[in-house]
Amino acid sequence: MASTTVCSAARIRVASSQVLRSIANTRTYATTSPESSIPETKPTAKRTPTTFKDKLNKGPSFSDFIGGATEPPLSPDEAYALKTALVGPAGKKKEITRLPSWLKTPIPDSSSYKKIKNDLRGLNLHTVCEEARCPNISECWGGGSKAAATATIMLMGDTCTRGCRFCSVKTSRTPPPLDPHEPENTAEALSRWGLGYVVLTAVDRDDLVDGGARHFAETVRRIKGKAPNILVECLTGDFSGDMEMVSLMAESGMDVFAHNVETVEALTPFVRDRRASFQQSLSVLRGAKAANPELITKTSLMLGLGETKEQVLDALKQLRASQVDVVTFGQYMRPTKRHMAVHEYVRPDVFDMWKEKAMEMGFLYCASGPLVRSSYKAGEAFIENVLKKRAKERIGGAVEDSVKGKDVLL
């Protein structure tokens, strides 16, 4: 009986192993394909020429480079035409406009740049260089052997109560309260940076009774107290047209009073916040000059927003009639997709033309170029072309008076 049971168990094991082998032979796996689905191997076809190879074949040969170009150079219109490119994955490519070569700038990296940036973070200070994404930050903060570093400090926080359509600064109807330590912190930072020229600007604070003018003016006084040799330019808002606050700022001890009209009068309603106007900006500039006739007044316009030549000329005439001393022209560059689109990339020779026009009209100085901003390289351009000139005239007049026996106070 026992032997019969053992034999039966052996037969079952043999049968089971045969079934398992059969199943294993017919099982399919995710990494294998049915024989019928395996494609036949075909000889590799000759690779089709790529777009890049086609361009090389159609382009100039080595002998062309040696022998010199035989075709005439591009016209200015062709040379400065907008460059486009397709970017993105297949099926979702988008056409983008490439920046012209004259609008490209180096990545910021220098010891002066790093020192300024670290101090800003440590003292909780802001700059319009960063907030407005200025393309010149590496050049201005870095300085050089022939030019002092410049920086534009943005006072009263990083949140503006207005919403201009060209500006990337944050906006809010109720921004945070003012930092009472900011005037002293700003003066302390600037006194140890070794700057030759500083530009102070501020967000608009329509939520404050004085628009922040007293806070702004106190900062100027603190800076002059700690570093009297630093030249201070103040780029102010319009203080809602309050001439008392404009006068307070003009008499704070600054060297340059700047207020930007930003664009031509016809485009102002479409470019700037509805609370700003071209005529109100002119009144601010006139008010500053009236409060302090020795003050240099300055403004800036962006080009590339769709303005016409006649509109720019009209703006210059009105600015000169308002006794504005200095004007700058720069290319408008769209900071984000939610801001106004660029209407045109203005050619460098057009900027040169506007500089000549401004100087012919009697402006003391004009900085004009695609990358010029209101405070662009102020320490280099402004000191050399305006402030030093006035200082020499003042010294010359003092010497003449001294020769005549008059009491002179320099």
From Swiss-Prot:
InterPro entries in UniProt: Aldolase_TIM (IPR013785), Elp3/MiaA/NifB-like_rSAM (IPR006638), LIAS_N (IPR031691), Lipoyl_synth (IPR003698), rSAM (IPR007197)
Transit peptide interval: 1-29
Taxonomic lineage of the native organism: Eukaryota, Fungi, Dikarya, Ascomycota, Pezizomycotina
Reactions catalysed according to its record: [[Fe-S] cluster scaffold protein carrying a second [4Fe-4S](2+) cluster] + N(6)-octanoyl-L-lysyl-[protein] + 2 oxidized [2Fe-2S]-[ferredoxin] + 2 S-adenosyl-L-methionine + 4 H(+) = [[Fe-S] cluster scaffold protein] + N(6)-[(R)-dihydrolipoyl]-L-lysyl-[protein] + 4 Fe(3+) + 2 hydrogen sulfide + 2 5'-deoxyadenosine + 2 L-methionine + 2 reduced [2Fe-2S]-[ferredoxin]
Cofactor binding mode and count: Binds 2 [4Fe-4S] clusters per subunit. One cluster is coordinated with 3 cysteines and an exchangeable S-adenosyl-L-methionine.
Organism for this UniProt entry: Arthroderma otae (strain ATCC MYA-4605 / CBS 113480)
Pathway named in the protein's UniProt entry: Protein modification; protein lipoylation via endogenous pathway; protein N(6)-(lipoyl)lysine from octanoyl-[acyl-carrier-protein]: step 2/2
Main location, first listed in the record: mitochondrion
PANTHER family: LIPOYL SYNTHASE, LIPOYL SYNTHASE, MITOCHONDRIAL
Enzyme class: transferase
Protein name stated in the entry: Lipoyl synthase, mitochondrial
Positions of [4Fe-4S] cluster 1 binding: C129, C134, C140, S375
Superkingdom of the organism of origin: Eukaryota
Residues that, per the record, bind [4Fe-4S] cluster 2: C160, C164, C167
